[in-house]
Amino acid sequence: AKTPKLISLNAQTGTTYTLVLGDADKLVEMNNAAANTLTVPPNSSVAFSTGTQIIVVQKGAGTTTIAAGSGVTLLSKDSALGIGGQYGAATCIKIATDTWYVIGDLA
C-alpha cells in the first residue's frame, strides 16, 4: 500500500507573509486578529516548480488576502482573493511561470 504524504505546517502570526520555496506543497496558516496578506512572489524571486500546491488557511479572525507579487497573475473565481472567513482555506496551484490558480473559500 502507498503511504500517504503528510503535509507540513508553516504557522504565520504577522500581518504580511511572502511565500518561500520551502512552502511548496505545505499548509500556510495565517493567524492574526487583524487583516493580513499572503503574497505569491514572481518566479524570478522564488522558482516554484509548475504544479506546486500551497494551501492557505485563515486561522485568525483577520481576513487573509492572497496578493500577486510583481508580474504574477492569480486566477480565481470572480477575481476573489480574500479567504471567506476564519478557518476558511484556499489552495494556490502554479500552472505556468508566473500564473497560479487560487481555488477554495474565497470572497
Where are these regions (language model features)?
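Terminal beta-strand-rich extracellular "head" domains
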Residues: 70-85
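Short tryptophan-centered beta-strand motifs in secreted/extracellular beta-sheet-rich domains
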Residues: 89-93
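A generic structural signal for well-ordered coil/turn residues at beta-strand boundaries
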Residues: 24, 86-88
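Exposed extracellular interaction/assembly regions and N-terminal maturation sites
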Residues: 1-70, 94-107
